[in-house]
Amino acid sequence: AGEIVRRRPYLKVKRLPALYAHNRHMRVEIVYFDGCPNWQEAGARVGAAAAGLADVEITYRRVTTDEEAAALPFAGSPTILIDGTDAFDDAVPVTELACRVYQTDTGLMGLPTVTQLNEALRRRQSRS
């Protein structure tokens, strides 16, 4: 299990152990608002998807206003950013607090699957 560090009241950091020294650090940020029922499970799925990958930092950013949402790369809650870029190419930015849906093999869901997240992390890792 990783260590939780509080940097700001709205930002939690969980570091997963590095297993392979040759891979670079990756930062995954989960952008959410409190009314979203899926943001905590998103963190659990990202953690599961990152298992076995080196030096992955998982952070959470709580969005509280439409203005904040408009100023961020936010495509609805939960938005999962890898090194500041949406993990999925089909992201459509929104300017208000809204829930997001993801296309999965079983249809539209409020979260991507662990497999989809693992593929997104590995794609991003291979680009570095």
Please identify what each model-predicted range represents.
Residues 26-48:
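Local sequence-structure signature of Cys/Sec-based thiol-disulfide redox active-site neighborhoods
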Residues 72-76:
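Thiol/disulfide oxidoreductase modules built on the thioredoxin-like
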Residues 56-66:
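Thiol-based oxidoreductase modules, predominantly thioredoxin-like and allied folds used
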Residues 87-122:
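Non-catalytic, surface beta->alpha helical segment in thiol-disulfide oxidoreductase systems
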